């Protein structure tokens, strides 16, 4: 720190982990940050037209971080017991190597660049911080199961394979003020994030439709945790319609009215071929990673009465309910109200019902429950995370009872959420329903200080 104008900070990390082999046990992860408080320069202070700017700092940083979030000793080849084999009339006890390992595994590295500024205006009345970040992760620790043929008879342990990039903007704005006996503050944040898979390394498997990835939720050029499935156009409203629709017998052996109509997107020649199949007709549908995240904190106080509120939300994110959460009669389970009310009714057929024809679905999936935009949901939401109202008795009253401070308060945590998701399900948790929901909690309390 030189004269509160020029700032420099650096960190040098040399970390070791027993989860990597001897030759790659250690990793070196440096970082540095610089800042320039231009508002402390003489030419800035002497310019009266800039008096409204109380503080202005430009900043930049660069750094590397390592990740060792894997199991213990994944690089070691071990024999697993219980690999028994019949020999004649006897069952012989056996052991075998069931996992292919990588003896050269090492630290996963993430490199980050960050540029931005911090500012304060009118002596703290308003603040604004903005930054742009570029983050790239190399040598991702991952199990590329799709890179190994099942004929091998072995699974794959973690190895360094794949690269990923995240870029985005972060904004923070704050305002605080006093008006008579009222003091208040408002702080908001907003971020834009773009995630992209650059490579899966040995997991780069080219699909017949030209996309390169693991065939399920990781593809080069797309975000992580993506939904990969079919485009649809409602359901069949008559059995005669089935004959006029592209052949989708590879998905539904015998389509009938009430079944989902899957679109024919492409074929071996790059154009629709009159058939719907998993090799050419699956596309990117959306991602579980939010593109936008935001938050708002509010606070106010008036003569002992105080109020605070925290709001949080995301947008530009997709969700999909599966299993017990999304499918009626799943594993001989229940039928939810929205499924019953929105299901296809053969007596009153609709092209775009909320649910296709009712049928029992196994625990795995059914013909009408394949990943598709029919089941895709907008998982954006705004949630009131916390709200608290309190009152502190005046000291002239509490001191008579020998109490220095007495405050009563009521708090509500997660009291309400605004979203377009299925009623009763939390858009923040993409699941098949086997989880405890986020609870709403209401509390009354007393703070007593002598």
Region spans (language model):
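Conserved SET/PR-domain catalytic core that frames the SAM/AdoMet-binding pocket
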Residues: 187, 280, 290-304, 385-390
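Short helix/loop capping segments that flank catalytic or ligand/cofactor-binding pockets
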Residues: 69, 228, 239-240, 308-310, ...
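Glycine-rich, aromatic-lined ligand/substrate-binding cores of catalytic
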Residues: 285-321
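Extracellular/periplasmic, surface-exposed regions of secreted and cell-surface proteins
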Residues: 1-220, 367, 371-450
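Extracytoplasmic gating/loop element in the C-terminal half of outer-membrane beta-barrel translocons
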Residues: 17, 314-407
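Phosphate-sensing "switch" segment of ASCE/P-loop ATPases
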Residues: 220-222, 303, 329
């Amino acid at each position: 720190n030189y004269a509160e104008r020029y700032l420099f900070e650096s960190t040098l990390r040399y970390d070791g982990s027993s989860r990597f082999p001897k030759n790659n046990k250690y990793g070196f992860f440096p970082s540095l940050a610089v800042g320039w408080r231009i508002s402390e320069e003489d030419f800035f202070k002497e310019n009266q037209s800039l008096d409204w700017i109380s503080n202005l700092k430009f900043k930049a940083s660069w750094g590397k971080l390592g990740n060792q979030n894997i199991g213990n000793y994944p690089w070691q080849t071990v024999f697993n017991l219980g690999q028994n084999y019949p020999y004649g009339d006897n069952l012989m006890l056996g052991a075998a190597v069931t996992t292919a390992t990588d003896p050269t595994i090492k630290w996963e590295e993430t490199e980050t660049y960050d540029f931005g500024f911090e500012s304060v205006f009118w002596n703290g009345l308003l603040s604004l911080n903005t930054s742009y970040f570029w983050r790239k992760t190399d040598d991702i620790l991952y199990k590329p199961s799709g890179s190994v043929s099942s004929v091998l008879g072995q699974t794959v342990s973690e190895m360094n394979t794949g690269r990923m990039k995240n870029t985005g903007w972060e904004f923070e704005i704050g305002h605080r003020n006093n008006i008579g006996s009222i003091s208040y503050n408002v702080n908001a944040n907003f971020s834009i994030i773009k995630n992209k898979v650059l490579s899966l390394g040995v997991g780069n498997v080219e699909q017949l439709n030209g996309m390169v990835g693991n065939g399920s939720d990781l593809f080069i050029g797309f975000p992580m945790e993506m939904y990969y499935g079919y485009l649809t156009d409602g359901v069949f409203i008559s059995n005669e319609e089935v004959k006029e629709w592209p052949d989708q017998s590879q998905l539904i052996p015998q389509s009938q009215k009430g079944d989902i109509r899957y679109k024919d997107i492409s074929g071996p020649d790059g154009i629709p071929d009159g058939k719907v199949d998993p090799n050419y007709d699956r596309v990117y549908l959306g991602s579980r990673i939010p593109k936008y995240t935001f938050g708002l904190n509010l606070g106010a106080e008036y003569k002992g009465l105080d109020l605070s509120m925290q709001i949080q939300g995301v947008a530009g994110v997709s969700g999909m309910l599966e299993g017990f959460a999304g499918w009626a009669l799943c594993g001989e389970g229940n039928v939810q109200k929205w499924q019953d009310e929105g299901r296809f009714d053969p007596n009153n057929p609709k092209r775009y019902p909320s649910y296709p024809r009712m049928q029992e679905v196994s625990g795995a999936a059914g013909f009408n429950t394949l990943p598709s935009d029919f089941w895709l949901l907008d998982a954006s939401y705004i949630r009131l995370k916390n709200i608290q109202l309190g009152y502190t008795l005046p000291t002239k009253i509490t001191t008579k009872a020998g109490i220095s401070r007495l405050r009563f308060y009521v708090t509500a945590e997660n009291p309400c959420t605004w979203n377009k998701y299925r009623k009763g399900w939390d858009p923040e948790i993409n699941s098949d329903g086997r989880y405890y929901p986020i609870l709403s909690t209401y509390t009354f309390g007393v703070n007593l200080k002598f």
